[in-house]
């Protein structure tokens, strides 16, 4: 079709320039929402008396026909983008009246509207997938409230904890992600439609009507801002980066735990791969892929922040670069959440190996220090005493539970027989009953709270 902007020009763009400027290869993803936006715009034009009834009926029928044949459409780079491609297809169906659809509308507010609509659909789908992941985490946690494992700092064994407590830490990370996405929807559910190229329009349009038809909750009060704003995209990319960071941290732990050196978890065959050379291998490839894809999602955020950092108002062609990054991020984070959900749901935690790991370390050292405090010794002094006891064990090739009472009393005479039950890792975990702690009762309370959060939806 003739370029929408062709009247000003005396020669066509070169084929190379045309291909370089075209976005149809990726923005065709917006086809369905573009038609949705056009239907709302056309209905508003009719209700405002800008379109005749017969014109509205023709345009509506044509757009709905395009909706039913969406998968069959053939797009061309000659028509640059999804908007011009769909206008060409509509013109082929209903004739010149299709040109009236663009009354009081620019591609600037049109593409912004499309992006708002598309992102709303995606964010809702991502929220649903995150909730499913959280549900799976609570199911695994429920089975492992009293499964004891080493807790780590600096990847060194620190204190014994409940496996459920560890799993639920990620539940709350994803809960914050869900909160951020829900808040992001407030900015996504704003309508730029009717802002025109930048300055509004002389036609008596009703922007609130078209917003209502599209399910938007607000209308941009400034037309310049409406077509220039991509904050909602940047905000989403930042949230998606945080989701991927949380997934990547969890994946890192799974990769470590699945190694023979730890052997804390067994991933199902459905979420593992082998080696083309080494027949014994069972690799956590999908956890590694999620960890690796996190970097690309970060790159999309930084890339688009850099694109937007020096753009004057209003629209600039640079902003065409918003789509590939956000589409790639959306696909990546959604797939990652869904793959990770299946991986966790089908994983088997090796409870005996986890418990055994707590029996052969010094993660009960804090229990000994706390015991001394209950005997009236200041914590800093108790810390020093226990440090010397640990050093003695390291030099002697034993653990705190192996020391005799007479040996303990060389470090301090207040230590008595009642110390030994406290050194048991299961008892050590059970006793940590403070709110949010790893004690079994506290973890059950936390699990109930997590389930309550999911029931709110």
Swiss-Prot record:
GO biological-process terms attached to the record: arginine biosynthetic process via ornithine; L-arginine biosynthetic process
EC assignment: 4.3.2.1
Keyword terms: Amino-acid biosynthesis, Arginine biosynthesis, Cytoplasm, Lyase
Molecular-function GO term, any one: argininosuccinate lyase activity
SUPFAM superfamilies associated with the record: L-aspartase-like
Pathway: Amino-acid biosynthesis; L-arginine biosynthesis; L-arginine from L-ornithine and carbamoyl phosphate: step 3/3
Xref: InterPro entries: Arg_succ_lyase_C, Argininosuccinate_lyase, Fumarase/histidase_N, Fumarate_lyase_CS, Fumarate_lyase_fam, Fumarate_lyase_N, L-Aspartase-like
PROSITE patterns: FUMARATE_LYASES
Superkingdom as given in the UniProt entry: Bacteria
Sequence similarity: Belongs to the lyase 1 family. Argininosuccinate lyase subfamily.
UniProt xrefs under NCBIfam families: argH
Protein name per its UniProtKB record: Argininosuccinate lyase
Lineage: Bacteria, Bacillati, Bacillota, Bacilli, Bacillales
Gene: argH
